[in-house]
């Protein structure tokens, strides 16, 4: 009897394991596109202050007019560390992981959580110009 029970268990495991592995792969984050996903968030929430002559540009030297200017960062250094959102000040500023007085967008409603997650995932995926 023990042999039959063990055989049933092994059969169930052999059938179930591939299914579990398949389902685990279904939750992979899709590739985030700078042009399609991130740039619209930046344009909607950051452009007003971070263009030439804007208050954000004057204070920090940070322009968001292109991918290149975004990756260049501020006069103090880069704001994005590809692969590492927690070391990326852009992510930390919009995610509210800083003092409220410097949270971005400054003086406006916070960026929706889903859009912050998009920025985070884009950085995790290497902050590519795609």
Model-derived features with residue positions:
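Aromatic- and Gly/Pro-enriched helix-to-coil junctions and flexible linker segments
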Residues: 23-130
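Intrinsically disordered, low-complexity segments
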Residues: 9-10, 31
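Hydrophobic alpha-helical segments, especially transmembrane helices
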Residues: 8-9, 116
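N-terminal secretory signal peptides that target proteins for export/translocation
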Residues: 1-8
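Compositionally biased non-globular segments, especially hydrophobic aliphatic-rich helices
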Residues: 8, 16-17, 130
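Short, surface-exposed loop and linker segments with low hydrophobicity and enrichment for Pro/Ser/Thr
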Residues: 11-14, 27
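Bacterial N-terminal signal peptides
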Residues: 13-22
